Design a protein with these regions (language model features):
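Short, glycine-/Ser/Thr-/acidic-enriched flexible segments
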Residues: 22-24, 29-31, 66, 94-95, ...
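Active-site phosphate-binding/coordination module
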Residues: 98-157, 274-277, 286
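Long, contiguous hydrophobic alpha-helical segments, chiefly transmembrane helices and signal peptides
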Residues: 15-26, 37-38, 45, 94, ...
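N-terminal small/polar loop signature for handling phosphorylated ligands or for N-terminal nucleophile
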Residues: 60, 65-123, 226-281
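Gly/Ser/Thr-enriched, mixed-charge loops and adjacent short helices
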Residues: 6-15, 124-256
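A short acidic (Asp/Glu
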Residues: 70-73, 215-218, 283-285
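An N-terminal, well-structured beta->alpha segment
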Residues: 1-76, 165-201, 213
């Protein structure tokens, strides 16, 4: 009976594509995140892009540190490629705001981020973005949702091999060039560089990426702005989709700061900073 209930839960419905895209447990079944549900969502997105005349513009794809994120990113890319839509895929995990930047920089019609934000490690998800760099909004959200709903036969989802997609010029790896352009733009947002110059060599900052995407870009920005004393929480420094040091990888939760606060006391920090595993939301404990 227990097994039957689990099978029913996995298959009793389709994982719904809403305004936030897909989000669900990773596993087999139509009500789970897996390569087939990712292909279904992407086939619907591809159909919508083609209907909007955006086929030639391409789609940028990023992913976070969660289980299966790189694999799901490639599944989405290869489905797009099989539909004649070029995919620009990051060479490793990146924070979500960089995806928004990349798709505008590259002139893409759409973007995809494989992430489940700060959900528990059993989850993954799929977020769709439009050419303005924001998550899908009317009328595109309902347009894409309708196209995804129309895709009912799992045997009709298009895909192709990575080798064929590359050979056809429909799969391009992106990375350092976008990173450099993105960070250059971020640095332009600084209002008082003179204030950083005055205190940067003395201010002590503790930072934790919470096993997510922020480690490299956040440290790079802080260093290039002139902050000399940045201490990264070692237990949470490297990407890990199991989030072994926290039960809930959300910087708004006090528990997420436990190791950061401990390191902060040890080094007498002036500031403790955390970012969500997928990168966009920094948080500072009061």
């Amino acid at each position: 009976p227990g097994n039957e209930k689990e099978i029913e839960d996995r298959f009793y419905r389709e994982l719904e594509f809403g305004t936030g895209g897909l989000r669900g447990w990773i596993g087999a079944g139509t009500n789970r995140m897996n390569i087939y549900t990712v292909r279904k969502a992407t086939q619907g997105l591809a159909n919508y892009i083609i209907s909007q005349g955006g086929k030639e513009k391409g789609v940028a794809i990023a992913y976070d540190s969660r289980r299966m994120s790189p694999e799901f990113a490639d599944e989405a890319a290869l489905c797009l490629a099989a539909n004649g839509i070029k995919a620009y895929v990051f060479d490793a995990l990146r924070p979500t705001p960089e995806l928004s930047f990349a798709l505008r920089k590259l002139g893409c019609i759409s973007g995809i981020v494989i992430t489940a934000s700060h959900n528990p490690p059993e989850y993954n998800g799929y977020k769709a973005y439009w050419e303005d760099g924001a998550q899908i909004t009317p009328p595109h959200d309902t347009g894409i949702m309708d196209e995804v709903k129309k895709v009912t036969d799992y045997s009709t989802f298009k895909t192709m091999s990575l080798e064929d997609a590359r050979a056809a010029g429909l799969y391009e790896t992106i990375g350092a060039v976008i990173d450099d352009a993105y960070i250059a733009e971020l640095k332009k947002l600084v209002v008082h560089q003179d204030a950083i110059d005055a205190v940067g060599k003395d201010l002590k900052i503790v930072y934790t990426p919470l096993h997510g995407t922020g480690n490299i870009p956040v440290r790079r920005v802080l260093k290039e702005l002139g902050f000399k004393n940045v201490y990264v929480v070692p237990e949470q420094e490297l990407p890990d989709g199991d989030f072994p040091t926290v039960s809930y990888p959300n910087p708004e939760a006090e528990e997420a700061f436990a190791l950061g606060l401990a390191l902060g006391r040890k080094v007498d920090a002036d500031l403790i900073l955390a970012t969500e595993p997928y990168g966009p939301l920094p948080s500072v404990p009061h």
